[in-house]
């Protein structure tokens, strides 16, 4: 299915994005990252518009986002433009999401029909994280917008923490619901 293919393309694009970033080819990195971002928007839209939603797609899309963003953030930290504290907040949120998802979907009560549906705060957070990468790439291209870094970091940290808390509550509720059904 096309939406799943777009998610796989996004995962594959991560490799040249990281390589271009490490080689300080910021314009190429920016163009590749924009292409990956477009594929992210398209896969969800196509899946919903043409009723192509699937359990695989509900897992593959956020995995593609995590691979792209995590590799980008680690590389941006490595080259010295992303602070460690923000990388750690993002990492903790991702651990909460992955641990909760594994716990829920490996549970006895989950079914093949379960679809992972991201919350609004999670969608906003993903957009803000993508915007952060784009912003940092523009700074590396000397666009002259670096005076807003601290504010951008705080906005992304806040949305990431709120999204992590939202997922934490979601997984606790789902776990309690599973336990009460036993």
Predicted regions and their residues:
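Residue-level signature of the cytosolic catalytic core of signaling kinases
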Residues: 1, 24, 52, 56, ...
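Hydrophobic residues in alpha-helical membrane-spanning segments
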Residues: 4, 15-17, 63
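N-terminal membrane topogenic signal
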Residues: 1-9
């Amino acid at each position: 299915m096309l939406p799943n293919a777009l998610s796989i393309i996004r995962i594959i694009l991560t490799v040249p994005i990281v390589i271009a970033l490490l080689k300080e080819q910021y314009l190429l990195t920016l163009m590749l990252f924009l292409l990956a971002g477009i594929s992210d928007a398209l896969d969800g839209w196509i899946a919903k518009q043409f009723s192509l939603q699937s359990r695989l797609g509900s897992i593959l899309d956020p995995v593609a986002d995590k691979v792209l963003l995590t590799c980008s953030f680690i590389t941006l930290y490595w080259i010295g433009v992303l602070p460690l504290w923000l990388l750690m907040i993002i990492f903790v949120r991702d651990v909460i999401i992955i641990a909760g998802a594994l716990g829920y979907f490996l549970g006895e009560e989950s079914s093949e029909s379960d679809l992972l549906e991201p919350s609004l705060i999670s969608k906003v957070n993903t957009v803000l994280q993508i915007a952060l990468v784009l912003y940092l790439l523009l700074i590396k291209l000397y666009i002259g917008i670096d005076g807003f870094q601290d504010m951008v970091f705080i906005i992304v940290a806040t949305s990431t923490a709120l999204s992590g808390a939202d997922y934490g509550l979601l997984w606790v509720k789902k776990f309690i619901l599973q336990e009460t059904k036993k």
